[in-house]
Amino acid sequence: DLGRAGVERAALHSAWDFTVASTESLTGRMLALRDGAFAELDGKAPAYRITTVIEAPDDGIRRRIEGTFDVPLYLTDGGRPGGRFVLGDDGRPTRVDGTFTAAFRCDLPATDSTAPARLALYGHGLLGDLGEMSGSLTRRMAQDHNIVYCATNWYGMAEEDIPNAARVLADLSGFDSIADRLQQGILGFLVLGRLMVHDQGFVADPAFAVDGRPVIDNSRVYYDGNSQGAILGGAFLAVSQDVTRGVLAEAGMNYGLLLDRSVDFDEYLNGVLKPAYPARIDRLIGMAAV
């Protein structure tokens, strides 16, 4: 192989082969999830359940609505951290029995506006959760611009995934469990976006009404993601059929380059990855490969 490539062994330090990315390898599985899930919906609103409605939970929030929604399941182990795709003969994920239950939160802003609020999906940061949506800056944005923010978790890279992420850092051969669940998580964002714009979704629910009138404008939904939410938000926006505009704030770069340079990663680097892979070159190649 080296000879065919015109590489002289005398000047060679090391060599290895690897597979480069293709359109199919980058997008094929995620598009299979999206197309299969929305074909299953067949134009209907996704199923959801409201579990909590809290009036004025924080400054700037008129009402907080929390609940769960159903996402077609493509992972083993019920979709829990560590679950993986079941691949068909074509190499694409196959549907698994049951559904994945995803959490959501929506905050209605306390404003004087009588116009229905625009809708936005929020994407949280590194290994966080949907609660980041309710921070002071987002609340101010919602008040100033009459926006109802809704969020779910980036399953695969959410707070509940930290134990599995630590296991993977100790053995990078298990990285597929993160990548697979993360695509299930992106599917969750797609389904929540559909729930936000569908005429039989949130806009038809009394929890999203005041004095019998809907307080949201479901004609369009936007996306707002920060840090990890900006990195993963790019993939989400690329495959979303309902969201055409979004903000990707402080996105940084792909994880293979970012993590080794991030102070937020120091705890995992020093506590798990370095002991498992003492040589820096091994760590860099491993992170680049995944």
What are these model-derived regions, one by one?
Residues 161-168, 234-290:
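Hydrolase active-site cap/lid region
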Residues 2-4, 198-215, 271, 275-277, ...:
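Short mixed-charge
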Residues 79-101, 113-211:
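Cap/lid segment of the alpha/beta-hydrolase catalytic domain
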Residues 220-233:
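Gly/Ala-rich beta-loop-alpha elbow adjacent to hydrolase catalytic centers
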Residues 25, 72-74, 125-129, 155-159, ...:
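Solvent-exposed loop/turn segments at secondary-structure junctions
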Residues 47-116:
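N-terminal cap/lid segment of alpha/beta-hydrolase-fold proteins
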Residues 17-19, 66, 119-122, 148-153, ...:
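Structural recognition of the beta-strand scaffold that forms the well-ordered cores
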Residues 1-51, 56, 84-92, 125, ...:
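Acidic, Ser/Thr/Gly/Pro-rich low-complexity segments and short DxT(G/T)-type signature motifs
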